[in-house]
């Protein structure tokens, strides 16, 4: 599995700001979208382009545009919504496919509860967004679902990942690409990433 820990100074600075214990909901939400946008930039760097001729201000001009499969952004509810706008900022024509997963706090296993995908999933590249890759369960289950619906090209974008989650995702889906702002130290006994960001969903939605 291709794993990219984005080392760009802007990414490292912004993810550092998100670790503050007293960060406001507004600021956390803004930074989640900003880092999501920067991860999208990295994840789409290998998109193929083609040369076309358009009518410019002073006659015909050759330009490059993206070709091939179109994109669907797949936020994993609810926290993934915090990164969605960052993706759409770069790819405003992307379709939105929503998957609802929550983690059972006792078993730490993902529980699906909602699904609404683009109708043409086999012809789209899926960018799955979720702030945290902890145990990897929610991401793995979401990718299982996308593959069942015919999606063959999938990239996962997460703000922070635990080594345990990276390993689990690699075992389950070695063909997927992972882009993250940081691979952190470990998971604690409650399944939270250390040092991590805390509960990203609560911080994005102001329910902490």
Swiss-Prot record:
Pathway terms, separated by semicolons: Pyrimidine metabolism; UMP biosynthesis via salvage pathway; UMP from uracil: step 1/1
Protein name according to UniProt: Uracil phosphoribosyltransferase
Regulation: Allosterically activated by GTP.
Database matches in SUPFAM superfamilies: PRTase-like (SSF53271)
Cofactor(s) it depends on: Mg(2+)
Lineage: Bacteria, Pseudomonadati, Pseudomonadota, Gammaproteobacteria, Alteromonadales
Gene3D superfamilies xrefs: 3.40.50.2020
Cysteine-cysteine disulfides: none
Binding site for uracil: 193, 198-200
Gene from which this protein is expressed: upp
PANTHER family reported for this sequence: ADENINE PHOSPHORIBOSYLTRANSFERASE, URACIL PHOSPHORIBOSYLTRANSFERASE, CHLOROPLASTIC
Note accompanying the cofactor annotation: Binds 1 Mg(2+) ion per subunit. The magnesium is bound as Mg-PRPP.
Keywords in alphabetical order: Allosteric enzyme, Glycosyltransferase, GTP-binding, Magnesium, Nucleotide-binding, Transferase
A GO molecular function held by the record: magnesium ion binding
């Amino acid at each position: 599995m291709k794993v990219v820990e984005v080392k760009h100074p802007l990414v490292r600075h912004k993810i550092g700001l998100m670790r503050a214990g007293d960060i406001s909901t507004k600021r956390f939400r803004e930074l989640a979208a900003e880092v999501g946008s920067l991860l999208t930039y990295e994840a789409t760097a290998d998109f193929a382009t083609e040369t076309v001729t358009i009518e410019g201000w002073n006659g015909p001009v050759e330009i490059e545009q993206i070709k091939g499969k179109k994109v669907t952004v797949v936020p994993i509810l609810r926290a993934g919504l915090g990164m969605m706008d960052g993706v759409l900022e770069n790819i405003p024509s992307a379709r939105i496919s929503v998957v609802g997963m929550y983690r059972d706090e006792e078993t730490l296993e993902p529980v699906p509860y909602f699904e609404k995908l683009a109708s043409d999933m086999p012809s789209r590249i899926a960018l799955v967004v979720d702030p945290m890759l902890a145990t990897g369960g929610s991401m793995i289950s979401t990718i299982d679902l996308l593959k069942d619906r015919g999606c063959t090209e999938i990239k996962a974008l997460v703000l922070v990942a635990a080594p345990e989650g990276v390993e689990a995702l690699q075992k389950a889906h070695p063909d997927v690409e992972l882009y993250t702002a940081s691979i952190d130290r470990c998971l604690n006994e409650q399944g939270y990433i250390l040092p991590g960001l805390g509960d990203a969903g609560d911080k994005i939605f102001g329910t902490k």
